[in-house]
């Protein structure tokens, strides 16, 4: 069964690209035609590539990969946060801080600061401070939450990055590539497909299209991890059955020895 239907793509407006004068020629093979100065994306290719991306992401999730969702423009912020949380993965949906991946140790220090402020707020420590100091710490926490809240539980750099609009998220993509982190991206007609490992050509400026593709990537992660959990449960059951069998064997052997 296909991950996405043609009807879903059409209803979401996934086929509308950018103005022809703003295109990146490297996206030519994913363009069907142009109408009224707008490129139209070949949704037959989008269907196939979205399906390939779904299966690839599902496989990575089944193998235990950690994911990071990135989408900081206004059309993507809500979908990125909602779907990342649903899939239980890290996300960045406001400005990408340079060095988030390539200078992870420094970022981790700031995340630890955020966690300290969270704890202080929760245990009532802020209430014991002078109003001015409490206000300053509150503002500091709010700023850290905005930019780092989505990656606060990320223990290390991710194994895979999903991006909405790699042109907008150019710095994030470059950091990922420098660390050999595979990039899965929803890419429009103005993007450079050569910077992306797993491509899904689609309108990355339409909120409904962004929500559709992002939700499918979240679905793939959830499905892959459920398969991983099922495999772990199966392995545990096999081990338990084996242990029970060994217990039966030992009991049988003891009985035979007693009879002898």
From Swiss-Prot:
A Pfam match: Ribosomal_S2
What Gene Ontology terms for biological process does this UniProt record contain? translation
Entries under InterPro entries matching the protein = Ribosomal_uS2, Ribosomal_uS2_bac/mit/plastid, Ribosomal_uS2_CS, Ribosomal_uS2_flav_dom_sf
**Spans of biased composition, class Acidic residues?**
243-260
One GO cellular component term noted in the UniProt record for this chain: cytosolic small ribosomal subunit
**Annotated stretches, region: Disordered:** 224-260
GO MF annotations for this entry?
structural constituent of ribosome
Q: Which UniProt keywords apply?
A: Ribonucleoprotein, Ribosomal protein
Concerning HAMAP family, the annotation shows: Ribosomal_uS2_B
Note the NCBIfam families from the entry. rpsB_bact (TIGR01011)
Family according to the record: Belongs to the universal ribosomal protein uS2 family.
The protein in question is named Small ribosomal subunit protein uS2
The record's gene field reads: rpsB
């Amino acid at each position: 069964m296909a991950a996405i239907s043609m009807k879903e793509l059409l209803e979401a407006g996934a086929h509308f690209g950018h103005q022809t004068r703003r295109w990146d020629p490297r996206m030519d093979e994913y363009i069907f035609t142009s109408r009224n100065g707008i490129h139209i994306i070949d949704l037959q290719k989008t269907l196939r590539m979205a399906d390939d991306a779904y299966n690839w992401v599902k496989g990575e999730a089944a193998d235990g990969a950690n994911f990071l969702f990135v989408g900081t423009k206004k059309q993507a912020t809500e979908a990125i946060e909602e779907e990342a949380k649903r899939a239980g993965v890290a996300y960045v949906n406001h400005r990408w801080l340079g060095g988030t991946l390539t200078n992870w140790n420094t970022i981790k220090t700031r995340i630890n600061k955020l966690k300290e402020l969270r704890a202080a707020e929760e245990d009532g420590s802020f209430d014991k401070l002078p109003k001015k100091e409490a206000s300053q710490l509150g503002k500091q926490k709010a700023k850290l939450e905005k930019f780092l809240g989505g990656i606060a539980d990320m223990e290390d750099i991710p194994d895979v990055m999903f991006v909405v609009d790699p042109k907008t998220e150019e710095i994030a993509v470059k950091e990922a590539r420098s660390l050999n982190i595979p990039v899965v991206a929803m890419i429009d007609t103005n993007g450079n497909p050569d910077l992306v490992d797993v491509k899904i050509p689609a309108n990355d400026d339409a909120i409904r299209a962004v929500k559709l593709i992002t939700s499918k990537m979240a679905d793939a992660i959830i499905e892959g991890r459920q398969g991983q959990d099922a495999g772990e449960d199966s392995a545990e059951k096999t081990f338990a059955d084996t242990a029970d069998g060994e217990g039966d064997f030992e009991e049988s052997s003891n009985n035979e020895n007693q009879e002898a």
